[in-house]
Amino acid sequence: MDFELTASMMCANYGNLEKEVRDLEAGGIDSFHIDIMDGRYVPNFAMSLNDMAYIASATEKPLDVHLMIEHPNNNIHIFLDRLRKGDTVYIHPEAEYHPSTTLQKIINAGMIPGIAINPGTSIETVMEMLVIVKKVLVMSVNPGNAGQMYLPYVGKKITKLLAIKDEMNFEIYWDGACGADKIMQYAPRGVKGFVLGTTLLFGKEAPYGETLQNIRELRF
């Protein structure tokens, strides 16, 4: 079963970010997930613009930048100028006056446009944007903090997205409380990738390479 694993870098050891990036890359991670929070759209702060730029310079692996900020269109150029073609930028539609304008700027910069869907956001409210984006990041927890519990009703949202993803040409990614059971349940059904945090990847005794290999060898 072919699925992507991306490391949630807000869960990494900030005291030695260089080593974390190096070890994750050597361990076989597919991409790095960067959570940017402004303390307004979500009640917390996470990684900084400098953290994002450093990781972009330290690896050739793709970055998935998740903008949990109000009105990202106002400052989207600051992020795009520090990323590489082929990196992904997710925005929250609720945080923007005209999200399609912001998504078009991401496309024009040569990056992959994505939207993040909160647990309380219905698919019907973002349907028009699904023809623009290439990736949909489904939040299985409310955004803003690591280590939250999975919200079971998100499963119905993923089922709806799986039914239309091929027709509308986007891929689905899972973010939040991602355990082995969720990968085993949803990867065979067509979820393309999973953001790994403290549940499966970080804070474990085993090296990253061993942990990632064990995840890839899950039996479906």
Language-model-detected regions and their locations in the chain:
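Hydrophobic faces of well-ordered beta-strands that scaffold small-molecule active sites
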Residues: 3-9, 32-34, 63-67, 87-91, ...
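N-terminal active-site wall of soluble small-molecule enzyme domains
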Residues: 38-105
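Glycine-rich phosphate-binding active-site loops on the catalytic face of alpha/beta enzymes
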Residues: 89, 93-96, 137-147, 189-211
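Alpha-helix-loop-beta-strand connector modules within alpha/beta enzyme cores
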Residues: 45-65, 108-114, 154-172, 214-220
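Catalytic cores of alpha/beta
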Residues: 21, 71-82, 121-130, 178-194
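Glycine/Thr-rich beta-alpha phosphate-binding loop at enzyme active sites
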Residues: 39-46, 119, 127-159, 166, ...
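Alpha/beta enzyme core
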Residues: 20-34, 78-86, 126-139
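Conserved, mostly hydrophobic/aromatic
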Residues: 17, 24, 35, 79, ...
